[in-house]
Regions:
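Short, structured surface patches at the beginning of a domain
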Residues: 1-166
Length: 166
């Protein structure tokens, strides 16, 4: 009688992986930004859709918009709805026009970019800042990313002071 091998031969495991990257477009417009044509909701949508136009692997899951809300507070309706969808595993990537659209609070922005999104396996892209969290050679990481977030926060504080002085 032949002996049975003690070596375990692994059975192949087949998993269903979507060929698409479910993508959230996040757009924020503050009251002050509303005066600037370059940050309008329509302009932001155009920039994001133009960025995705030659990237067929990205599928827009939803567009989350916060209109007339400050970037210093992350308790925004559209942003919170996006976080709920991330928690539910519906989103693989978040794309914004630039880092200031995510927020103007350097600590909270850093938390979402460096901790929250990676812990939920969510890729983060800031189009005009040329930041993509999936790119290991990203020169905008390291010291540049926190520096840009601090500049965005300082800008918000400066605008707040100017408005109060009027």
């Amino acid at each position: 009688m032949a002996r049975k091998s003690r070596k375990h031969i692994a059975e192949p495991i087949f998993t269903s992986v979507s060929p698409f990257i479910n993508t959230a477009l996040y757009i924020r417009l503050s009251v002050e930004d509303n005066k600037k044509r370059g940050n309008s909701i329509e302009t932001q949508k155009m920039v994001l859709k133009d960025y995705l136009s030659n990237k067929p692997e990205f599928r827009i899951y939803d567009t989350y918009i916060d209109n007339g809300t400050t970037g210093t507070n992350f308790n925004r309706e559209g942003f919170q709805r996006m976080l709920s969808d991330i928690e539910a595993g519906k989103i693989d990537c978040v794309i914004v026009k630039d880092l200031s659209r995510l927020g103007r609070n350097s600590i909270d922005s850093g938390y979402y970019i460096e901790q929250y999104f990676p812990s939920h396996n969510v890729r983060f892209i800031a189009v005009t800042d040329q930041f993509d969290s999936e790119n290991p050679d990203n020169l905008h990481g390291g010291i540049i990313l926190p520096l840009k977030n601090m500049i965005n926060e300082a800008y918000s504080l400066d605008i707040g002071r100017k408005i109060k002085a009027q």
